[in-house]
Amino acid sequence: MTCQAFASSDNFVPLNSDSSPSLPLIMHHSAGECLPVSNHATNVVSTVPSVLSLIQTPKCSHFHFAMMTSGNVSAGLHYSVPSCHYGNQASTYGVMAGIKPATPEMLSASLSQSRILQTCSMPHPNVVNGVSTLQSSLTPCLYKFPEHALSASSCALGHSFTPMHQTLLSDDPTASDFKQEFRRKSKSVEEPVDMDSPEIRELEKFANEFKLRRIKLGYTQTNVGEALAAVHGSEFSQTTICRFENLQLSFKNACKLKSILSKWLEEAEQVGALYNEKVGVNERKRKRRTTISISAKEALERHFGEQSKPSSQEIMRMAEGLNLEKEVVRVWFCNRRQREKRVKTSLHQNAFSSIIKEHHECR
């Protein structure tokens, strides 16, 4: 028996067979979707009793099998299957075999059998005989229903079909190799890092040393992030530096950041050393304390008694006579006036306190 695809739905093409009567075939799939004839035919027919329980479900499309013999109806089967649609088509996928032009006898027989099936939970004996006759007389051509429309829960005929994609994937060695490779890579990525490894110990040691050396150089975590932006183009946030010092980054990210921070730390220490040397050379030295001899002090005391506020020319003359610098003589007179002022203030305070004391004693 051969099957031929229809160009459009609801067209009938007779099956070419000499041993069987002229059987029309309704189909809405292409010829490429026709499965080879196998023992699935028995499965389809054997599922009829289980389909009978689905008769009362709404929106069902009906399959009508009938075996015609020289104008007499020997047996007929009428049962419902949930409608299956594909895309925007409203047509129903299915097969229809053994239908001839309807006659009043055929319609009455179909109507009576439909009523019997709707009121009884078990199939009628005539229906069972009709199924046996149909199974022995017909060689149906099976078609694969759309997988998105027919499932094990929505269509009883789906129990006898195996999804094509599962068979292909299970038999394809390339797919199995790909799955094994994917599992191997996933396992290698998810392997935990050994916390006692030398790499972890070295990373902890560097994080502690980096924190101490950063504080010694006077940099904050924010300063480090801004300084790295000038070198690498992207600024590192203060949170990133803090998480690195506290070992809160992942091992992979911490290793990447370690090389960057190590290079920056070396450059920062070199710049800091050069800065300290430059500041040490240019730093203003403290002037050494000048000592004045006793004879020079006596001479300056005599001049102070004569003039407590000498002019600039007089200070220069005294400095030349005593072999001292002019600035030394000027500073000595300033200090001497301040000391005299403190002495006079203390004398006035003592005198005032003594007067007050005498006044209280007189009372």
Swiss-Prot record:
Q: In which tissues is it expressed?
A: Pituitary gland.
> Among the record's GO biological process terms, what is one?
regulation of transcription by RNA polymerase II
- The main location class comes to nucleus
Gene Ontology MF terms: DNA-binding transcription factor activity, RNA polymerase II-specific; RNA polymerase II cis-regulatory region sequence-specific DNA binding
Q: Which SUPFAM superfamilies match?
A: Homeodomain-like, lambda repressor-like DNA-binding domains
Q: Which UniProt keywords apply?
A: Activator, DNA-binding, Homeobox, Nucleus, Transcription, Transcription regulation
Where does motif 9aaTAD map?
5-13
**Domain POU-specific: residue ranges:** 195-269
Q: Which residues form the signal peptide?
A: none
Q: Which Gene3D superfamilies match?
A: Homeodomain-like, lambda repressor-like DNA-binding domains
Compartments, as annotated in UniProt:
Nucleus
Sorted alphabetically, the Gene Ontology cellular component annotations on this record are: nucleus
Q: Which CDD domains match?
A: homeodomain
Q: Which residue ranges hold the DNA-binding region?
A: 285-344
Please report any disulfide bonds recorded for this protein chain, giving both cysteine positions: none
Q: What is known of its domains?
A: The 9aaTAD motif is a transactivation domain present in a large number of yeast and animal transcription factors.
Per its database record, what is this protein's job? Transcription factor that activates growth hormone and prolactin genes. Specifically binds to the consensus sequence 5'-TAAAT-3'.
The text of the family note is:
Belongs to the POU transcription factor family. Class-1 subfamily.
Q: What is this protein called?
A: Pituitary-specific positive transcription factor 1
Organism whose genome encodes this protein = Gallus gallus (Chicken)
Q: Which gene encodes it?
A: POU1F1
